[in-house]
């Protein structure tokens, strides 16, 4: 994912590694952790900040690299938690997995079969075209567009380390019901379930079956872990949030109320029903005295997360007033936090 999109890359003569970053709204935003040894990260961050003439932030920093940013004078705030699965312990057995197990059994009874797809195989073009169609249908139904920064793309047009798992009906002879694109996590011997798509009328249990089959397949191949990705703004429980009370209030307000264009609650609930073995915190680090509205705006822009089309999608005339009311409340809250930070 770090090699996709319109990112730039910083290297230092003093460190074997690099930072992926993007400039947005006058800010420099680092994508995830520095790619280097933990012991070398402070030096790489220091060189990077010295080379930039703008405020610097880093989105989705892990606890492993958090101290490196703190050593270089960065403040930080928790922005959500990432769902992590230990593949050696992954199972559908037990009471807590009853709903997921029932969904997978339903899909199997309906003839849904999961296989790995290779986009550059000789006979792959037909399925590639169908994958694109399913993706566009899903995005249109959700009122979304492809997000960026730390989310990958479908990438069917170029060879890569991505792996594609496809669920097809009629015992693998029918249409594509849904699919998942996985990205390798080299440092942890695992994979990230990056892009998940399904038809609007997909067989019930399709995505649950995909997730379970992917985990079983990767475990059998000797991989250690799977990440379902970040649940943004969910489970904000870091004690240091008290140092950023206004922004914390704003994030919790957005999580509870602002779910028209980007359903934070739904993202969390979907991950939570699989009962991850760990919820790892992720942070936004910044080298300013306070987390400014400008930095928040830059982060939203670089992720391409909110658009007017998204705000109004899937809402009729009766719902439009409610949407604008929520949007206005969000803007008022944002401005209040900004004014109070001065």
Where do the PLM segments sit?
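Polar low-complexity intrinsically disordered regions
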Residues: 335, 339-342
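Short, glycine-rich nucleotide/cofactor-binding loops
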Residues: 35-40
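A conserved beta-strand-loop-helix scaffold within acyl/acetyltransferase catalytic domains
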Residues: 1-34, 59-77, 82, 88-103, ...
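Inter-domain linker/hinge segments that demarcate the starts of reverse transcriptase
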Residues: 43-45
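Flexible acidic/glycine-rich loop/turn elements at helix↔coil and beta-strand↔loop transitions
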Residues: 328-333
């Amino acid at each position: 994912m770090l090699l996709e999109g319109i990112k730039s890359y910083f290297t230092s003569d003093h460190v074997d590694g690099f930072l992926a970053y993007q400039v947005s709204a006058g800010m420099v935003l680092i994508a995830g952790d520095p790619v280097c040894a933990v012991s070398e990260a402070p030096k790489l961050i220091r060189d990077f900040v010295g080379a930039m003439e703008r405020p610097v932030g880093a989105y989705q920093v892990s606890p492993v690299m958090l101290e490196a940013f703190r050593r270089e004078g960065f403040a930080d705030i928790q922005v959500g938690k990432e769902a992590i699965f230990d593949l050696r312990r992954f199972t559908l057995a037990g009471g807590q997995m009853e709903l997921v197990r029932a969904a997978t059994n339903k899909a199997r009874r309906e003839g849904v079969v999961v296989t790995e797809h290779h986009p550059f195989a000789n006979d792959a073009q037909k399925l590639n075209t169908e994958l694109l169609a399913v993706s566009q249908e899903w995005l249109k139904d959700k009122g979304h567009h492809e997000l960026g920064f730390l989310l990958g793309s479908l990438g069917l047009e170029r060879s890569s380390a991505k792996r594609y798992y496809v669920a097809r009906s009629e015992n693998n002879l029918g249409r594509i019901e849904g699919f998942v694109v996985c990205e390798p996590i080299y440092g942890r011997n695992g994979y990230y379930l990056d892009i998940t798509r399904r038809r609007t009328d997909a067989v019930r249990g399709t995505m649950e079956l995909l997730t379970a089959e992917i985990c079983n397949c990767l475990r059998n191949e000797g991989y250690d872990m799977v990440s379902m990705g970040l649940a943004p703004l969910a489970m904000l429980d870091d004690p240091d949030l008290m140092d950023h009370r206004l922004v914390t209030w704003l994030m919790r307000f957005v999580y509870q109320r602002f779910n028209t264009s980007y359903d934070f609650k739904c993202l969390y609930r979907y991950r939570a029903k699989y009962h991850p073995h760990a919820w790892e915190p992720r942070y936004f680090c910044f080298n300013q005295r306070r987390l400014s509205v400008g930095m928040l705006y830059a982060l939203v822009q670089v992720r391409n997360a909110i658009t007017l089309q998204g705000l109004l999608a899937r809402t009729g005339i009766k719902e439009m007033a409610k949407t604008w009311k929520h949007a206005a409340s969000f803007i008022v809250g944002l401005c209040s936090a900004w004014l109070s930070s001065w």
